[in-house]
């Protein structure tokens, strides 16, 4: 059945070659038995918010802008997979999440994040990328260290919310240097 209420903005188009528009919807309210509500587009820094503008900000890693435009934190949801446990061996265990291949991710790098586990939120730091210090593959994953958290969460479904870009992903000469950088990144996150 056709919806009894329809909302759209003035630039809304639909149908073959986007030939349908707000005028068509207004003109056909009685015929199809619905009420049209035309809403103004939301703006961010004096520009219309659109899915295109949001995707552009995501690909630029500008997560604060993304979150303001969305009205909520940008997030990925996934199951925590078993990894090589290298994070645990250096005292910085991580939750490894393989994101859905269709999910748009921010650029490879380290981000201040918040993780939601079983309804509870925790401050975290996440690396988006291929982990070049310890991996040789090209599969993108999200590897998250939950700050001051010790529980095992393998096979749990978690939500990772992105807030701030910290630095680009890079290769380190040793696990010790990687550990030192992660610890510095955690301190950066605590200060933000």
Predicted features by range, described:
Residues 83-192:
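Phosphate/ribose-recognition catalytic cores of enzymes acting on nucleotide-derived substrates
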């Amino acid at each position: 059945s056709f919806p009894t209420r329809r909302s759209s903005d003035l630039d809304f188009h639909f149908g073959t070659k986007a030939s349908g528009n707000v005028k068509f919807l207004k003109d056909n309210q009685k015929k199809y038995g619905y009420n049209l509500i035309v809403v103004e587009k939301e703006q961010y820094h004096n520009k219309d918010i659109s899915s295109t503008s949001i995707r552009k900000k995501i690909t630029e890693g500008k997560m604060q802008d993304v979150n303001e435009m969305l009205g909520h934190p940008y997030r990925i949801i996934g199951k925590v997979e078993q990894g090589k446990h290298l994070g645990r061996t250096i005292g910085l265990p991580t939750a490894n999440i393989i994101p859905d291949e269709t999910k748009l991710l921010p650029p490879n790098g380290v981000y201040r994040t918040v993780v939601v586990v079983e309804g509870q939120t925790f401050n975290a730091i996440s690396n988006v990328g291929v982990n070049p210090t310890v991996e040789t593959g090209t599969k993108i994953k999200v590897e998250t260290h939950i700050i001051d958290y010790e529980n095992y969460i393998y096979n749990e479904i978690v939500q990772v919310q992105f807030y701030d870009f910290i630095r680009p992903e890079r290769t380190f000469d040793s696990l010790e240097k990687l550990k030192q950088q992660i610890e510095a990144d955690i301190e950066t996150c605590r200060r933000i």
